[in-house]
Design a protein with these regions (language model features):
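Active-site-proximal segment of zinc-dependent metalloprotease catalytic domains
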Residues: 1-104
C-alpha cells in the first residue's frame, strides 16, 4: 500500500470505497462565498482524490448533504473520469438517484450478501425522497414513473425492467440503460424529472411537469453515447 498525506485525509477502505475527514471537508466548503450553514445541505461537494484507482463513491446524509469522491479514472468510455463525475456527483450527490447496475443474480429481499444494500436500505432512501428511479414494485401502476409509462411522449422508452440496486430480481428500473447503470451520459426520464424537481425546489420555484416535458431533451445523451461507442 502507498500512503499519501493529503488535505482531507482521503483514504481507500478495505471494501474498495473511499472515506475522509468529512467535517473538515464541510468546513472547507463553507469558505466558498455562496455556501452557508443553511444551504450546505443543498451544496454538492466533489473531492478529486490524487489517485487513478477506479472506484468513485458518494457519501450522503439524511439532510441532503453529499460529498462525491471522483478519482481520475484511466478507464475508457463510459467509465472514464467524466463518467465517474456524471454517476457519482450528478446522479448520487445531486440527483439522489440509486444505482441501477446488477452485482448479484438474486432476489433483493433474499440476498444474504454483506457488500451492498437491500430492501431496508432502499426503503430508507425512499423515506428521504431519494431513489425515485427505483421501485420494489413491478406493477406499471405501482412504480414512481407510471405517469411516464402512460404518457405517449415517453411510452416508447419508459417501462418496467427488472434488475437494479445491485440485484437482478425483486427491484425495478424504468429504462434499459442509463447513467446510474454504467455511467453513460444519459439520465433516464424519471431521473431527469427528479433532478429538475430538485433544482426547482432549491431555487424556490414550482415544478411543472408540462414545463419539464417542453424543455426535456431526451435524445441528447443517447446520441452522444452512440457517437462515443462507434
Amino acid at each position: 500500500n502507498t500512503i499519501r498525506y493529503n488535505r482531507f485525509g482521503t483514504t481507500f477502505t478495505g471494501g474498495g470505497g473511499l472515506k475522509a475527514e468529512y467535517d473538515e471537508i464541510f468546513s472547507y466548503a463553507l469558505g466558498a462565498p455562496t455556501v452557508t450553514k443553511d444551504n450546505l445541505k443543498e451544496t454538492l461537494i466533489i473531492v478529486v482524490p490524487n489517485s487513478t484507482d477506479y472506484g468513485g463513491i458518494t457519501q450522503m446524509w439524511a439532510d441532503g448533504s453529499a460529498i462525491a469522491f471522483c478519482p481520475l479514472s484511466t478507464y475508457g468510455y463510459p467509465l472514464d473520469s467524466r463518467g465517474v463525475v456524471q454517476h457519482e456527483a450528478g446522479g448520487h450527490g445531486f440527483g439522489k438517484l440509486g444505482d441501477e447496475y446488477i452485482y448479484h443474480n438474486a432476489f433483493i429481499d433474499a440476498c444474504g450478501c454483506g457488500c451492498c444494500g437491500h430492501v431496508d436500505e432502499l426503503n430508507t432512501a425512499k423515506s428521504y425522497g431519494w431513489y425515485e428511479n427505483l421501485s420494489l414494485s413491478g406493477k406499471t401502476h405501482g412504480v414512481g414513473w407510471s405517469h411516464l409509462i402512460y404518457d405517449s411522449r415517453y411510452s416508447d422508452i419508459v417501462d418496467v425492467y427488472e434488475g437494479g440496486f445491485m440485484h437482478s430480481r425483486g427491484v425495478y428500473r424504468s429504462e434499459q440503460n442509463s447513467c446510474m447503470n454504467n455511467s453513460i451520459p444519459y439520465y433516464n426520464a424519471i431521473s431527469r424529472e427528479s433532478i429538475v424537481k430538485r433544482i426547482k425546489r432549491y431555487a424556490g420555484e414550482t415544478f411543472s411537469f408540462e414545463d419539464f416535458v417542453k424543455n426535456d431533451k431526451r435524445d441528447v445523451g443517447v446520441e452522444q453515447s452512440l457517437a462515443k461507442a462507434s
